[in-house]
Amino acid sequence: MEMFCYQCQETLRNEACVAQGVCGKSPETANLQDLLIYVLKGISYWANKARELNVEDESVDLFVAEGLFVTITNVNFDEGRIVEYIDEAVDKRRIIENKFKEVYEKKYNEKFQEKVPDAAVWNPKDNNEDEYLNKAVEVGVLSESDEDIRSLKNFLVIGLKGVAAYTDHAYILKHSNDDILAFIEKALAETLREDITVDELMNLVLKIGEYGVNAMALLDEANTSTFGNPEITQVYTGTYETPAILVSGHDLLDLYEILEQTKGKGIKVYTHGEMLPANAYPGLKKYEHLAGNFGGSWWKQQQEFEDFGGAVVMTTNCIQKPRNSYKDRIFTTGLVGWPDVQHIPNRKKDGQKDFTPVIQKALEIGPIKKREGKAITIGFAHEQTAQVADKIVEAVKSGKITKFYVMGGCDGRNKDREYYTNFAKDLPKSAVILTAGCAKYRYNMLDLGDIDGIPRVIDAGQCNDSYSLVLTALKLKEAFDLKDINELPIEYNIAWYEQKAVTVLLSLLYMGVKGIRLGPTLPAFLSPNVLETVAKTFDIKTI
């Protein structure tokens, strides 16, 4: 079986993965994910119709966001679970369709007669994987013949995946926004239109930027209202000789529950990858057994998890194929999945997840090896940065800071990403890097020093904390009484890998930022015509 996937930066030859995903995704998993997205579009068709009659179902809307999140790179490689999501998607679609038709018939005293797209009515006969795979071949990426329409439809879906991920994270912390969910469904439903134009699709793609900002703001509010505003924090990168759990991914609530359940058990907990910023939240750093951060970005995990020696928990995306050396001590939870890896089930209403299997494994393994480390400085989210804004402004006015470089985004395996390390090393000592996301691991261990106590690497947090970088830029614009954000002494050198980074890019464009340098390559899902339009309109370049 073949596949066609070009949603990430590492897609084969910067064209598409067709035999096997560079990420490790099988053709079967890729095709099942295509079908899941197809059914999500069908749900969205009915949800939009229902919303026109003031009929809503939050469980359906949230499922659409969750379903998109499942298809993000490195989230779920478990075919069986993708099949379960498709089963549930068909059920959710039926629920919202019936709700709509019931109200429609009462209001108009007649049955709904409009022509309905196949995604909204396709019903499997056998509900098995073979049937799903056969259907997936019909509805995958290449089912759209027009190159530019295909490019824009996929650009749209890829951007929506990031919005969906941030929205889902916020919902886990009891924060939701109906307008964001409604936009996701409206945009998905629009991709089913046979008469949609290039201009209409381009406008929808750019609209993602607005909702990307809204979703990041929602998640920021969820995180900070739950765990407090991040504080400037020194994080240790070594390990201690005790039983240990390493927590990777993005889900702060999972980390909190692990910390709660390991209190008094002699276990030290470490963050990994995108979980590093958790060490700066008051509600998490208060736990004395949160010992620091081990390792770097996601793509080094196979060696790092093997070396770590303790139990490992993957809370969101960024999982790679586990090596046999640690497969019996790695656990997934939430939307993450890998075949034959033990999964921690979701929490029941108002309860916690039960991380007992992880804790037992850590205790069974016993103490891990002691390693010396160094301290790195984190915690410069927008609230903390605002508290030192006067100092930053004064340093700019005095000429001690001459330029800021926003170097947020994702890290990855591509050797060309060494460019970002060299770029950081070669910056003048009067330059300051503003970063968020795992791209930071290319330079956050360098000894770049500080300027009057201001670190030359200002780390705002996870990829969603790019929102903090935007707020910081807007505050600087206000402080210098400028009319345009592009008048600031800021350059944008963004590294992308997966779909959330595309959402961040569109959010920056929405905020009016121009002249972004995007790398290490430009997205394969952009056709030549679409790429030319976007590059010319927003002055986007590559490295």
From Swiss-Prot:
Residues reported to bind hybrid [4Fe-2O-2S] cluster: 250, 274, 318, 410, 438, 463, 498, 500
Cofactor, how bound (note): Binds 1 [4Fe-4S] cluster.
UniProt modified residues of type Cysteine persulfide: 410
Subcellular location: Cytoplasm
Source species, domain of life: Bacteria
Main location: cytoplasm
Essential cofactor(s): [4Fe-4S] cluster; hybrid [4Fe-2O-2S] cluster
Keyword terms of this UniProt record: 4Fe-4S, Cytoplasm, Iron, Iron-sulfur, Metal-binding, Oxidoreductase
Biological-process GO terms, alphabetical: response to hydrogen peroxide
GO cellular component: cytoplasm
Any one GO MF annotation of this record: hydroxylamine reductase activity
InterPro entries associated with the record: HCP/CODH (IPR004137), Hydroxylam_reduct (IPR010048), Prismane-like_a/b-sand (IPR016099), Prismane-like_sf (IPR011254), Prismane_a-bundle (IPR016100)
Catalytic activity: A + NH4(+) + H2O = hydroxylamine + AH2 + H(+)
Residues binding [4Fe-4S] cluster: 5, 8, 17, 23
Root EC class: oxidoreductase
One Pfam match: Prismane
EC number, as in UniProt: 1.7.99.1
Family of the protein in this entry: Belongs to the HCP family.
Free-text function comment from the UniProt entry: Catalyzes the reduction of hydroxylamine to form NH(3) and H(2)O.
PANTHER family per the UniProt record, alphabetical: HYDROXYLAMINE REDUCTASE (PTHR30109:SF0)
Name listed for the protein in its UniProt record: Hydroxylamine reductase
Species assigned in the record: Petrotoga mobilis (strain DSM 10674 / SJ95)
Highest classification ranks of the organism: Bacteria, Thermotogati, Thermotogota, Thermotogae, Petrotogales
Gene it is expressed from: hcp
